[in-house]
Amino acid sequence: MAKMLPPPSQSVPSRPPSWLYIPPRRRHGTFTSSCAFRLSPSSPSSPPPPVLDFQYIQFMDSWIEQTSLSLDLNVGLPSTARRSSAPAAPIKVLVEENFLSFKKDHEVEALEAELRRASEENKKLTEMLRAVVAKYPELQGQVNDMMSAAAAAAVNAGNHQSSTSEGGSVSPSRKRIRSVDSLDDAAHHRKPSPPFVAAAAAAAYASPDQMECTSAAAAAAAKRVVREDCKPKVSKRFVHADPSDLSLVVKDGYQWRKYGQKVTKDNPCPRAYFRCSFAPACPVKKKVQRSADDNTVLVATYEGEHNHAQPPHHDAGSKTAAAAKHSQHQPPPSAAAAVVRQQQEQAAAAGPSTEVAARKNLAEQMAATLTRDPGFKAALVTALSGRILELSPTRTDPSLERR
C-alpha cells in the first residue's frame, strides 16, 4: 500500500531516495493529492510493493477531468475547456435564447402591416388638410370681394331708382326691400369668376349626394318669389276736386288718418300721407297729391290692400250719388281724365259678385301676409294685453283692492 509522505520542501532525506514522490497537480480547477512510492527493495518480511499501472493512472486523470466532478459554480453549463477558443457568451443572452425565443404569429404580422398602412394614410390626409387650410384665406378673400362689389352695385342702383322716382320720401321698409331685390338681381346676373366656373360646370353632373346645393338654390329662388309676392300692391286713382280745396281728401269709402305732408321736387303742390284707421292691423297707406298737369285732379296712390270691409255707414246709395256727381263734371283735357273715365266705366260695369270675389281674395292674401309677418304676433299680443289691463277690475273697483 502506498504511503503518504510530506512534500520534499519540509524534509530532505540525507540518504539516497528510496521513495518516488509525485507532487500535486492542478488540472482545470481541480487538485490531485501528492503521492510517494517506496523504491527500495523490500525486506523478506514486508509485503511486496504495489505495482503501479500507468493505464490506471491515465484513467484516473481522465475521470478527474470530468465536469460533473468539478467544484466550480458553472453547473449544467458547457465546459470551459470546450469553449476555450471562443469568448464566453453572457448569461442574459443564453436566458433570452432559451426562454424568450418564440415564433411570430401571422395575425401579429397582419396587424403590424395594417398599422403601417393606417399611419401612411393619416400622413396623406394631414397633407391634404394643410393644403385646404392654406387655400381657404384666398377663397374667402375672393368671396368677400364679390360680396362687396355686389353691395356697391346694389347701393348705386337704389340711389338711381330713388332719384328717378317721383319726388316723395320713401319709407325705410321700401328701401330695405329694394336693396334686397337689387342684391338678388345682382347675384343672379353676375358672371361667375374663374375659380367658380369649374364648380358650376361640375354641378351639372352632380351625383344624388350632391343635390343638396341644387335644393338650396331652389329654396333661395322660392324665397325670392315669395318676397316679390309679399310686396305691397300699388294702385292709383284719379279724382276731380276743387282747386281751392286744400284738404287733399279723397272719399273712397274707407276711414283714414293723416300723419304727414310735404312738398316734393317734381310738383309744387304738397303731398299728404294717410294711414288706414284700422292700422296696424291694416297695412294700407295712401298718398294724395294734385296732378302737376291739371290742378283739378287729385292723384291718390294706394300701397297694399285692405284686409277688412268698408265701414257700414257707407251704403250703395252714397256710392251711386257720388258716381253721378263725378259724371256731371266735364272731363279734363289731360291724360289723367282718360284714366278717370276708364276707372269709372270699369266700376259701373263690375257687378256685386265680382266685388265679393275681390274682397274674398283680398282677405285671403292679407291673412297669408299677416301669418308670414314675424312682428304680427308681437303686435297682437301687445294690443290684447293693453286692452286687458285697461278693462281689469282691479284698477276701477276699490273694493276689490281692499280684499
From Swiss-Prot:
Biased composition (Basic and acidic residues): 306-317
GO biological-process terms attached to the record: defense response; negative regulation of DNA-templated transcription; regulation of antifungal innate immune response; response to chitin; response to fungus
Predominant location category: nucleus
Gene Ontology CC terms, in alphabetical order: nucleus
Pfam families for the chain: WRKY
GO MF entry, a single one: DNA-binding transcription factor activity
Alphabetically ordered keywords of this record: Coiled coil, DNA-binding, Nucleus, Plant defense, Repressor, Transcription, Transcription regulation
DNA-binding region: 245-311
Annotated localization: Nucleus
Transmembrane segments: none
Conditions for induction: Induced by biotic elicitors (e.g. fungal chitin oligosaccharide). Accumulates in response to M.oryzae.
Domain of life: Eukaryota
Record flagged with keyword Chaperone: no
Composition bias, Low complexity: 162-172
Motif placement: Nuclear localization signal: 222-229
Disordered: annotated span: 157-178, 306-335
Coiled coil regions in record: 101-135
Function comment: Transcription repressor. Interacts specifically with the W box (5'-(T)TGAC[CT]-3'), a frequently occurring elicitor-responsive cis-acting element. Regulates, probably indirectly, the activation of defense-related genes during defense response. Modulates plant innate immunity against X.oryzae pv. oryzae (Xoo). Negatively regulates the basal defense responses to the compatible fungus M.oryzae.
Domain comment as written in the entry: The WRKY domain is required to bind DNA.
Family: Belongs to the WRKY group II-a family.
The protein's name in its UniProt record: WRKY transcription factor WRKY28
Organism of derivation: Oryza sativa subsp. indica
